């Protein structure tokens, strides 16, 4: 049904909706006009952040979407973020800020994985919330994350839906009970941790590097810095047909190359650097030897030039250039430009100055992509835009060479290389764990307590899980597990064999497992004196079974595979000579009990050592329980002692 409103299905795509509450307008045309005004206000309000942002594939955009199938008319946007996941989380920040700036708007956001906000906060979700019942429950309201809960008991809260709500039902609940549906502090903290630092974080995600580029590309990037993303993607996703256009360059001749500074996102820079590529000899692009100080600048420029040439080769040689004048002819452009001026987008620049025109060009381009016709055929492709700029922008190669002599220093790219310690720190920050005290790694390893391993494993084994699988203990302070001993022994009676007055059936009834379904249903029961005596006798029988099994296994290879405690002294012969136990145990030592903790720790350490520093079952299981083993130093190469 449309009312469930399943969103993004395309890979690496995020979709977002903004609803107006209360929605009292009955006139669809009037409602459309209201929402169009909101789109204009939102884009202009956040233009200082959105316009200069370099998007991996598609920018943040909003358009009017009419009501259909019970879903009211709303503002809708879709962005393909590709390999740069930071684009998606920046959009989450923008959506959060929109609902904060405009309290009458409610937003929901999903990607092709579904409710990815819940995935981010998976460690803190209530047990009832799962992918099957989370539809239309997660919204942003007043700048805060809200989750519409399910009723814990039938009839507890009449306004809570027992099934996933429809969009109209969800909007009504948010309107009437916005304070009661606020997500828990831990869930909100997990999401806020992911978007912490914006908008300042935008600058931290950029990387400036020197590139040896044709003059035409330098001029284009001065006017449209965001086109670097399209060029990198064209090179990164090239195929043999694309490279045919790069055998002989027709648009960007290598003879016109000059040094310039290019701003990438870190994702784009990494994509460009990590690919090995040898240009065709006929292209005219020659690289200096790798030892040359400017080798990296030449290599980056060569790759980027191939991307721009591929983009231009996909355009018709006679494409219409009338599209470039359609931006300022749009009826929305005048009001959009006026709103930009009111929001101090131009930062007090003098109208007509070079910097003013540069920001105006960026605004026109963003208006075309995000406001006027984000999915229209009138929108120019990147290649058409590049060719249009080459035809309309005058540039002087000599002036560009003078600018090349005074370039700002490029950024250090050491962030491309991560040490194991830095990787561990990033993983800990990703799950919200930080070391509160500055203890050296050597001190931690020396003071490491192996009992933490055994205690964590015991807690895991003691946790009663459901049919959905094993559950890791969430907190050490969790209540102890209750246990129905009577039901447990009845269960073992059927496993070990029937009593003389019982049938020989090996089948277990469904009710025999009910006591093991959930730790919430198990509890101690009070027994009558007769029942307690019977229970004690059953326990004694079970112990005798286990003792006999131990004696039989004591002389096999199985017993040698375990580490035992110190051997127990031989049983005194002066005890009751008529005892039945003397027949099998006289003159022999009682089998020493297995040291469970020592065996557990030694087996885990052996498994951890065999991982050779890679991921494996031992480290994965322990880390999921919050136990971090120190590095295995036994296999590290050590320097040989020198002779005096």
Curated annotation (Swiss-Prot):
Organs and tissues of expression: Highly expressed in muscle and heart. Over-expressed in pancreatic and breast cancers.
GO biological process, one term: RNA splicing
Modification type Phosphoserine: residues: 503, 505, 518
GO molecular function: histone acetyltransferase binding
Entry keywords, A to Z: Activator, Cytoplasm, mRNA processing, mRNA splicing, Nucleus, Phosphoprotein, Transcription, Transcription regulation
Record carries keyword Transcription regulation: yes
Region (Transcription activation): 439-644
Mod. after translation: Phosphorylated predominantly by CK2 on two serine-containing clusters; involved in cell cycle regulation activity.
Region (Involved in nuclear export): 481-497
Predominant place of localization: cytoplasm
Annotated localization: Cytoplasm; Nucleus
Result for mutant: residue 503 to A: Greatly impairs in vitro phosphorylation by CK2 and impairs cell cycle regulation activity
Region (Disordered): 430-449, 496-537, 567-589, 623-644
Subunit structure: Interacts with TP53, MDM2, TXNIP. Interacts (phosphorylated) with PIH1D1. Interacts with RUVBL1 mediating the PIH1D1-independent association with the R2TP complex. Interacts with RB1, RBL1 and RBL2; ECD competes with E2F1 for binding to hypophospshorylated RB1. Interacts with EP300. Interacts with DDX39A.
Family: Belongs to the ECD family.
Protein name: Protein ecdysoneless homolog
């Amino acid at each position: 049904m449309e009312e469930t409103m399943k969103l993004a299905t395309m890979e690496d795509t995020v979709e977002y909706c903004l609803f107006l509450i209360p929605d009292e307008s009955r006139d669809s045309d009037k409602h459309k006009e209201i929402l169009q005004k909101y789109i204009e206000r939102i884009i202009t309000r956040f233009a200082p952040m959105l316009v200069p942002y370099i998007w991996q594939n598609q920018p943040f955009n909003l358009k009017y979407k009419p009501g259909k199938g019970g879903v009211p008319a709303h503002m809708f946007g879709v962005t393909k973020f590709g390999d740069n996941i930071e684009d998606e989380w920046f959009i989450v920040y923008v959506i959060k800020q929109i609902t904060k700036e405009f309290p009458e708007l409610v937003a929901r956001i999903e990607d092709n994985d579904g409710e990815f906000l819940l995935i981010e906060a998976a460690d803190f979700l209530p047990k009832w919330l799962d992918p099957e019942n989370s539809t239309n429950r997660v919204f942003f309201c007043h700048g805060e994350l809200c989750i519409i809960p399910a009723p814990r008991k039938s009839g507890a809260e009449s306004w809570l839906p027992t099934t996933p709500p429809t969009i109209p039902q969800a909007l009504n609940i948010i309107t009437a009970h916005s304070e009661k549906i606020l997500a828990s502090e831990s869930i909100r903290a997990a999401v806020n941790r992911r978007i912490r630092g914006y908008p300042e974080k935008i600058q931290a995600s950029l990387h400036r590097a020197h590139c040896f580029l044709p003059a035409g590309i330098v001029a284009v990037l001065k006017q449209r810095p965001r086109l670097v993303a399209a060029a990198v993607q064209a090179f990164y996703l090239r195929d043999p047909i694309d490279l045919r256009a790069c055998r002989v360059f027709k648009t960007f001749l290598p003879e016109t190359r000059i040094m310039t500074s290019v701003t990438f996102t870190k994702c784009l820079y990494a994509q460009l650097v990590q690919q090995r590529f040898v240009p065709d000899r006929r292209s005219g692009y020659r690289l200096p030897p790798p030892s040359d100080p400017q080798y990296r600048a030449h290599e980056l420029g060569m790759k980027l030039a191939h991307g721009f040439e591929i983009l231009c080769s996909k355009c018709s040689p006679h494409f219409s250039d009338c599209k470039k004048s359609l931006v300022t002819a749009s009826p929305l452009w005048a009001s959009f430009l006026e709103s930009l001026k009111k929001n101090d987008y131009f930062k007090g620049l003098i109208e007509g100055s070079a910097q003013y025109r540069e920001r105006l060009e960026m605004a026109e381009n963003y208006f075309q992509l995000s406001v006027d016709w984000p999915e229209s055929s009138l929108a120019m492709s990147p290649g058409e835009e590049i060719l249009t700029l080459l035809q309309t922008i005058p540039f002087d190669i000599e002036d560009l060479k003078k600018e090349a002599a005074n370039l700002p220093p490029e950024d250090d790219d050491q962030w491309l290389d991560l040490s194991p310690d830095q990787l561990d720190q990033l993983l800990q920050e990703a799950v919200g764990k930080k070391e509160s005290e500055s203890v050296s790694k050597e001190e931690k390893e020396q003071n490491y307590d192996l009992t933490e391993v055994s205690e964590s494993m015991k807690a895991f084994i003691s946790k009663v899980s459901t049919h959905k699988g094993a559950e890791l203990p969430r907190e050490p302070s969790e209540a102890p597990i209750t246990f129905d001993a009577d039901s447990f022994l009845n269960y073992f009676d059927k496993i070990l064999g029937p009593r003389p007055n019982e049938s020989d059936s090996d089948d277990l009834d469904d009710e025999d497992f009910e006591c093991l379904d959930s730790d919430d249903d198990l509890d101690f029961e009070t027994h009558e004196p007769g029942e307690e005596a019977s229970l004690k006798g059953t326990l004694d029988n079970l112990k005798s079974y286990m003792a006999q099994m131990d004696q039989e296994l004591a002389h096999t290879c199985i017993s040698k595979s375990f580490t035992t405690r110190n051997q127990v002294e031989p049983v005194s012969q002066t005890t009751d000579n008529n005892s039945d136990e003397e027949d099998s145990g006289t003159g022999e030592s009682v089998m020493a009990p297995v040291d469970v903790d020592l065996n557990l720790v030694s087996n885990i350490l052996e498994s951890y050592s065999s991982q050779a520093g890679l991921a494996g079952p031992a480290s994965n299981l322990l880390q999921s329980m919050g136990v971090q083993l120190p590095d295995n130093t036994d296999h590290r190469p050590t320097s040989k002692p020198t002779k005096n």
